């Protein structure tokens, strides 16, 4: 009997809360609530917004470096070698390669945000 009373109480309270959640927002509807929110952009404007090519290049560079770090950096530890010197040499070589490519991007002004 106690289980039935508990279940009935829980179902009643849950149903009451769901009904309140559906009815309460409809009582004070105003124009800003009914308009779609598009991250600050006008939803009725042009869908072709200007796109910064510099942003695209910086994003692609970030993705390339991120993939290099995620895929190449664990390689020395995954090579199943017992020689610590070989593993550390491989890791150091990969870090030097990443640092050199970052320096190259920097000197070519690939990381400059402003034009």
Swiss-Prot record:
Gene Ontology annotations of biological process type: mitochondrial electron transport, NADH to ubiquinone
Role: Core subunit of the mitochondrial membrane respiratory chain NADH dehydrogenase (Complex I) which catalyzes electron transfer from NADH through the respiratory chain, using ubiquinone as an electron acceptor. Essential for the catalytic activity of complex I.
Pfam family membership, one: Oxidored_q4
Substrates-to-products reaction catalysed: a ubiquinone + NADH + 5 H(+)(in) = a ubiquinol + NAD(+) + 4 H(+)(out)
Cellular localization per UniProt: Mitochondrion inner membrane
Quaternary data: Core subunit of respiratory chain NADH dehydrogenase (Complex I) which is composed of 45 different subunits. Interacts with TMEM186. Interacts with TMEM242.
One cellular-component annotation, GO: mitochondrial inner membrane
Keywords annotated in UniProt: Electron transport, Membrane, Mitochondrion, Mitochondrion inner membrane, NAD, Respiratory chain, Translocase, Transmembrane, Transmembrane helix, Transport, Ubiquinone
EC number(s) recorded for this UniProt protein: 7.1.1.2
Protein known as: NADH-ubiquinone oxidoreductase chain 3
A GO molecular function held by the record: NADH dehydrogenase (ubiquinone) activity
Lipid bilayer topology: Multi-pass membrane protein
Gene: MT-ND3
TM region(s), chain numbering: 3-23, 55-75, 86-106
Family: Belongs to the complex I subunit 3 family.
Superkingdom, natural source: Eukaryota
